[in-house]
Regions:
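Acidic donor-binding segment of Leloir-type glycosyltransferases
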Residues: 1-35
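Active-site acidic Asp-centered loop
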Residues: 6, 58-61, 155
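C-terminal, non-catalytic tails of nucleotide-sugar-dependent glycosyltransferases
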Residues: 20-23, 83, 93-94, 105-133, ...
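Glycine-rich, basic loop-to-helix element that forms the pyrophosphate-binding segment
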Residues: 33-50
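Short aromatic/hydrophobic "clamp" motif used to bind/position activated sugar donors
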Residues: 55
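Conserved donor NDP-sugar-binding/catalytic core segment of glycosyltransferases
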Residues: 62-108
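A short, conserved alpha-helix in the catalytic core of glycosyltransferases
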Residues: 69-73, 127-152, 156-187
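Short glycine/serine/threonine-enriched helix-capping/active-site loop
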Residues: 85-88, 181-182, 189
Length: 228
């Protein structure tokens, strides 16, 4: 377990690190990132310390709520044609936050089925079916190390947004499948650690990321999402 510590201040955070170190011993490693927040750079930094055949990106504001979720994801990711597996993420009221990502939705890309109940099947039951999609969120994303090394690290130009979608696009372009596994479920307490995108500076950064993503993947955006 690699935890990247990024300027935390709460005592309970560090108490949690100590508890994990006692529980997992040498399997747990805390590494420090002293720079500003850049989601791509922080994950790339942490991955340098990982030794496994598979890499799981997992946000600090998530909680696994379905037993065996990570095993389900790993079982799928072991297939040779699969490059990435993503999970179903729920808000704390058990409505859907993420059930896959659709290219071109909400402008550039957006989460599918956001706001429906966890027990709602959705259009053609697609909210609850294991399936191939264009992209999944990196809040909980499992990928092969070999694939990560083949397509390259997360693009650090995307400091906060679109880095996961960009990585999925690179993996799909390399010929691998992106799989959404709804039977792997987590709560995602989004924005509780960083805050919402509600300041002028954040909006300016977000706008730049949108333009960079469009410039990079214009042809694919014009063509449309093949899974939607």
């Amino acid at each position: 377990y690699i935890v990247v510590e990024n300027n935390s201040v709460l005592d309970e955070t560090f108490a949690g690190y100590e508890a994990m170190e006692k529980k997992y011993g040498d399997r747990f490693r805390l590494v420090r990132w002293d720079g500003g927040f850049n989601y791509s750079a922080i994950n790339n930094y942490g991955i340098q310390y990982a030794k496994g055949e598979y890499i799981l990106l997992l946000n600090n504001d998530t909680e696994v709520i379905e037993p065996g979720s990570l095993r389900r994801m790993l079982a799928i990711c072991q297939r040779s044609e699969v490059g990435i597996v993503g999970a179903k993420l729920l808000y704390d009221d058990n409505t859907v936050q993420h059930a896959g990502i659709v290219m071109g939705y909400q402008g550039v890309a957006g989460h599918a089925f956001t706001g429906i109940g966890d027990d709602v099947y959705g259009y053609f039951a697609r909210a609850v079916l294991t399936q191939e999609l264009s992209a999944v969120t990196a809040a909980c994303l499992l990928t092969k190390r070999s694939v990560f090394e083949q397509v390259g690290k997360l693009d650090e130009t995307f400091e906060v947004a679109f880095n996961d979608i960009d990585y999925c696009m690179k993996v799909r372009e390399a010929g691998y499948q992106i799989i959404y596994e709804p039977h792997a479920k987590l709560h995602h307490y989004e924005y509780k650690s960083r805050g919402a995108e509600d300041t002028g500076k954040k909006q300016e950064r977000f706008g730049g990321e949108i333009m960079h993503f469009i410039d990079k993947w214009r042809a694919q955006l014009i063509k449309g999402d093949p899974y939607y």
